[in-house]
Amino acid sequence: MPKVGMPKIRRPQLVSATMTVIDRVGLHGASVSLISQEAGVSSGIINHYFGGKHGLLEETMRDILRQLSCDATKRLNLLPKQAHMQRINAILDANFVGFQSESKVIKTWLAFWSYSMHDEALKRLQRVNEKRLLSHLKRELKALMSKEQADIVAQGIAALIDGIWLRGALNPEGINANKARIIINDYLEKQLTFYSQQ
């Protein structure tokens, strides 16, 4: 977390610069010097407020996760509570459309995933993100099937989101949101049919 006193205008500037530099040279090449140059600030500001590159990566991921959460919430708020399939698709769109599908965000996500396996602070952020996604999905799925079934199907959808997202991230053409929606809805319809026959 950044120290108190960091001017609010600087945070978005530094977060954006971090993503831009990661997009351009990768995480290992994204030095404090390059990030500060991109942001138009001194390296000392990054070291003072964030304790270096690691702290800035953590703040950048917090920002990306906040934006993902806000986007999902906005999309859900536009839909009736009973429109469960539409609401599930809104959750998918929050993950595959707009800001989350920009090249600089995708590359920052990939860096975050690899680092979060070995870093407790980043691992906590990943767990928060995973719990939030599963919570959104289960809320909608429980209206369509039993709680136990909803738990299993939510895990399946989350795995598909991660897998499709990763494949899209590594594809030069990027993430195909329409194809992602088709694949996940096909899985969901098959699960609904299967569980309705139980």
Curated annotation (Swiss-Prot):
PROSITE patterns: HTH_TETR_1, HTH_TETR_2
SUPFAM superfamilies membership: Homeodomain-like, Tetracyclin repressor-like, C-terminal domain
Keyword tags: DNA-binding, Repressor, Transcription, Transcription regulation
Residue ranges of the annotated DNA-binding region, renumbered to this chain: 31-50
One Gene Ontology term of the molecular function aspect: DNA-binding transcription factor activity
UniProt domain HTH tetR-type: residue ranges: 8-68
Keyword match Repressor: yes
Pathway assignment: Amine and polyamine biosynthesis; betaine biosynthesis via choline pathway [regulation]
Regions crossing the membrane: none
A biological process from GO: negative regulation of DNA-templated transcription
Function, in words: Repressor involved in the biosynthesis of the osmoprotectant glycine betaine. It represses transcription of the choline transporter BetT and the genes of BetAB involved in the synthesis of glycine betaine.
Protein name: HTH-type transcriptional regulator BetI
Species for this entry: Vibrio vulnificus (strain CMCP6)
Lineage of origin: Bacteria, Pseudomonadati, Pseudomonadota, Gammaproteobacteria, Vibrionales
